[in-house]
Swiss-Prot record:
It is found in: Cytoplasm. Belongs to the RecX family. Keywords: Cytoplasm. Modulates RecA activity. Its main location: cytoplasm. The gene is recX. The keyword Membrane does not apply. InterPro entries: RecX_HTH_1st (IPR053926), RecX_HTH_2nd (IPR053924), RecX_HTH_3rd (IPR053925), Regulatory_RecX (IPR003783), WH-like_DNA-bd_sf (IPR036388). This is Regulatory protein RecX. It comes from the Bacteria. One of its GO terms (cellular component) is cytoplasm. GO terms for biological process: regulation of DNA repair. It comes from Enterobacter sp. (strain 638).
Length: 166
């Protein structure tokens, strides 16, 4: 006769899942809540955890209390990661907003980060269009559109030609 193990309480299962999720990389609270609420793929297919809203709140509080969840650390690392991938401040702000980070926390982290956005914009333009950067109007417009899409501010884009005319 096969004896099945009794199911662990929903809180314990949620807590295990939260620690596993946060062990891979930092998440915002909103991201963690979304991932915890998603069904778990088990041996018998997708399976929802029958947890209450109080269970989710307790897990989130535990994660904050034990420093598994830290929005300041998440924002700082996210800005560094996205800037290394060549994205500008406007795009990064928008992505952080989508992840549920408060605007004031985002702005404070953007002020504290040590990134020269003008230099980063120039590096992205050179990587895409080569050195020296084209000086024809139509090519400048292409570069401008590309950098705006990547999230750079117009003043940083215009500074490329103003400061690096060589």
């Amino acid at each position: 006769m096969s004896e099945s193990k009794p199911r662990r309480p929903a809180y314990a299962r949620l807590l295990d899942r939260a620690v596993r999720i946060l062990g891979v990389r930092d998440h915002s609270e909103q991201e963690l809540r979304r991932k915890l609420a998603a069904p778990v793929i088990g041996k018998n297919g997708p399976e929802a955890i029958d947890a209450t809203e109080e269970d989710y709140d307790r897990v989130i509080a535990w994660c904050y209390e034990h420093s598994y969840l830290d929005d300041t650390r998440f924002v700082t690392r996210f800005i560094a990661s996205r800037s290394r991938k060549g994205y500008g401040p406007a795009r990064i702000r928008q992505e952080l907003n989508q992840k549920g980070i408060a605007r004031d926390a985002t702005e404070q982290a953007m002020r504290e980060c040590d990134i020269d956005w003008g230099e980063l914009a120039r590096d992205q333009a050179v990587r895409k269009y080569g050195e020296p950067l084209p000086s024809e109007f139509s090519e400048k417009v292409k570069i401008q559109r590309f950098l705006l899409y990547r999230g750079y501010l117009m003043e940083d884009i215009q500074a490329i030609w103003r400061n690096f005319t060589d």
